[in-house]
Amino acid sequence: MALLRALLGLLACTPRPSAAYFGLTGNEALTILPLTSEMEEAAVKAHYKVCDRLKLEKKQRRMCRRDPGGAETLMEAISMSALECQYQFRFERWNCTLEGRYRASLLKRGFKETAFLYAISSAGLTHAMAKACSAGRMERCTCDEAPDLENREAWQWGGCGDNLKYSNKFVKEFLGRKPNKDLRARVDFHNNLVGMKVIKAGVETTCKCHGVSGSCTVRTCWRQLSPFHEIGKQLKQKYETSLKVGSTTNEATGEGDISPPKKSIPGHSDQIPRTTDLVYIDDSPSFCLMSRYSPGTSGRKCYKDKNCDSICCGRGHNTQSRVVTRPCQCQVRWCCYVECKQCTQREEVYTCKD
């Protein structure tokens, strides 16, 4: 699969000393590292090796090493973030291209696409860590054991909740503290926090009733995170409404703040960004033609009545006809399988012209 080839490709980014980075915005290779028999036989040594293969900063590597489940959770976060990013942008000119040279160039600029990468990476790590705690894969955390619910006396806290409290603490420490002066570093930090806040806002309480004939005299309740696909959907919406910002100085603290650009720019809002808004510094390129930021859209598959005009950037599209075989007229047979016929049909495939 093209996606797996992208994830298995190695990446070398230029290190940035201003803050800690991870996932789709980090220095590590976008690699899905398999759990081998060697890892099962020598778990501690193996997880140290994985932490070393993820090109982390010194503090991040130490945090990865201190829990046997850390490396697996970090890899899961990277994979989950990459898959969701490519899913959310599958119909866009920039389709979350993660090949090394394109991603490295993109991360050097403060585009709105870069903002999304920071948010989805921090969200992925927050989500993966909270789930790892509740699944018992981490030694330093367990289930969410501190319910703060109304009418607690009527509820029995017996479910295994996702441990967002520990996850937030871990991610904040892992990604580093808020920088004071550099605008780009502050913007990246802000977008990291947006990803974490979307995770927190999506926490739901799930309950199961116990009692005679379903009377629900006792309820077992626990907290669960929203599915990560829902998180990705919300972050994509925030990408669509992201705000361009500049830099100002807070007279009370002397520290820099992010704010709307000093001069009004046509097409951009002067709205002061909220803590839940994605923000960016630089206007994005069109992504129509091959550049340092993307391979362009030449040859990209599109959908005639949906996005060919947009993705192909006015160059038009080619039409090819092909015959495909698909399961059809499926029926459930007792017991217990589905029986289908194989039907052939002709379909048209549309790709962008050069």
Curated annotation (Swiss-Prot):
Main location: secreted
Signal sequence, renumbered to the chain: 1-15
Residues that carry a glycan: N95
GO molecular function terms listed in the Swiss-Prot or TrEMBL record: cytokine activity; frizzled binding
Region (Disordered) location: 246-271
Post-translational modification as stated in the protein's UniProt record: Palmitoleoylation is required for efficient binding to frizzled receptors. Depalmitoleoylation leads to Wnt signaling pathway inhibition.
Protein keywords: Developmental protein, Disulfide bond, Extracellular matrix, Glycoprotein, Lipoprotein, Secreted, Signal, Wnt signaling pathway
GO biological process, one term: cell fate commitment
InterPro entries, alphabetized: Wnt, Wnt9a, Wnt_C, Wnt_CS
Location(s) in or outside the cell: Secreted, Extracellular space, Extracellular matrix; Secreted
Record function comment: Ligand for members of the frizzled family of seven transmembrane receptors. Functions in the canonical Wnt/beta-catenin signaling pathway. Plays a role in embryonic chondrocyte maturation and in embryonic bone mineralization.
Protein name (database record): Protein Wnt-9a
Source organism of this protein record: Gallus gallus
